[in-house]
From Swiss-Prot:
Enzyme class (EC, first level): oxidoreductase
Protein name as catalogued: Short-chain dehydrogenase/reductase family 9C member 7
List of residues binding substrate: S160
Residues the record lists as binding NADP(+): 29-53
Subcellular location, record wording: Cytoplasm
Amino acid sequence: MAAISDLSFMYRWFKNCNLVRNLSDKYVFITGCDSGFGNLLARQLVDRGMRVLAACFTKEGAQKLQQDTSYQLQTILLDVTKTESIKAATQWVRDQVGEQGLWALVNNAGVGLPSGPNEWLTKEDFVKVINVNLVGLIEVTLHMLPMVKKARGRVVNMSSSGGRVAVIGGGYCISKFGVEAFSDSIRRELHYFGVKVSIIEPGNFRTAILGKDGLEKHMRKLWERLPPETRESYGEEYFRIYTDNLKSTMQLADPRISEVTNSMEHAIVSRSPRIRYNPGLDAKLLYLPLAKFPTPVTDFILSRYLPRPADSV
């Protein structure tokens, strides 16, 4: 028991020694703080004594977060799909951080819907997701980078296991693959400025990313707007099984979202942040192996998850 106690003490000592100094003086800007990962991360960083600048999409989300935390947290409304909103947020952050710059930019804002079989979706469905998850992330980063460079700080980008292997149709996985590519490219470029870039690739966690209306209602809407010939080619049984499989996946989602926010926090406060974080057992044991298997093997495994269409050959 004494040996275990000593090892535990040494681990905590090393962990604390590897932290960035003067965290209480450093500013962190986080997008998507209404709920989920962004909301919990903002609270964790306030508890650490950091100065948190939290961007929310709704007034209600901003007010509740402000009420529940201390003076060290300030909120602003931000729509990452609108350039003017991003410009206003950038000026606000610049006014807050002054000459010391921005220690960490956390691009967390994201949406999951519309998603489904690609043929069931429209161009607008793809654009809606990509504009938030990828284009918005890129534009926020480009506006904030001068302040991050000044602080020799961090960029932490929220991707997904779906950014390593495409598990569902629609703009979600496409946008997350784009986040991976953008993050890899800026990491190499910003290395020379002393800026570190980390990518968070969670598995399946329970958040509000699928919106308020519910998955079944979303899938029914996609199905009912399809042309009759497309519905016939898939069949009602395909729709039912596909929807049930998605619902089962969501029901199995891990509610312990602190696994994700702890990874995000480590990327911000550690002197040696990782390039990639993979919170969640499914991320480590399922999605990462699927991403590394030969493509025909991955296709075979994932195709078993999809129902057979009525007109299959």
